[in-house]
Regions:
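Conserved alpha-helical scaffold segments that buttress catalytic/binding sites
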Residues: 1-165
């Protein structure tokens, strides 16, 4: 099964970036002039993703992109989604955690744990602080949880096409 993972920042001509520690949304003054027109967004959704008012798909709107991972867990637990599944990730950022400490924890400690116990873990210690799954690494966690079998990353056409973080 394929899951569409669509971040609205894809529809910007200038790609916003924030430090991982930032918990609040960027001020609209920072990006307000770079948002695609409604016509451009509709054209992309209808022509590239085959979405329309007549072809609706079930889903959820979330504020923090890492909430998608929580939604996927809910769908799996309710048997509405089976894993592993394929993700079509339409975003200005890859959300694979490079640039944060999670990749190091996942590689050095997490992957040594029994597979059955991995999904119970969503926090780790880094520099004497407890860190959790974030908007910048949730997709990496989904792969580590073995929820995701493949990722098709549709990078923002206005970006450098080399964003794997």
């Amino acid at each position: 099964m394929k899951v569409l993972d669509l971040d609205m920042d894809y529809f910007m001509t200038e790609i916003a970036s924030t430090p991982f520690s930032c918990e609040e949304r960027l001020d609209e003054e920072y990006y307000g002039d770079s948002v695609w027109t409604e016509e451009e967004v509709r054209q992309f959704l209808e022509q590239n993703l085959r979405l329309s008012k007549n072809h609706k798909i079930p889903g959820r709107i979330v504020t923090g992109h890492n909430e998608a991972l929580i939604f996927w867990k809910e769908l799996i637990n309710s048997k509405m989604l089976s894993d592993p599944f394929d993700v079509v990730h339409v975003d200005s950022h890859a959300d694979l955690g490079l640039g944060d400490a999670s990749w190091s924890f996942l590689q050095s400690e997490f992957l040594t744990l029994p597979i059955d116990s991995r999904r119970k873990i969503s926090e780790y210690e880094f520099c004497n602080k407890i860190k959790g799954i974030s908007i910048g690494d949730y997709l990496l966690w989904a792969v580590a949880y073995r929820m995701v079998s493949s990722i098709t990353y549709c990078a923002n056409p206005n970006g450098d096409k080399n964003d794997y973080v």
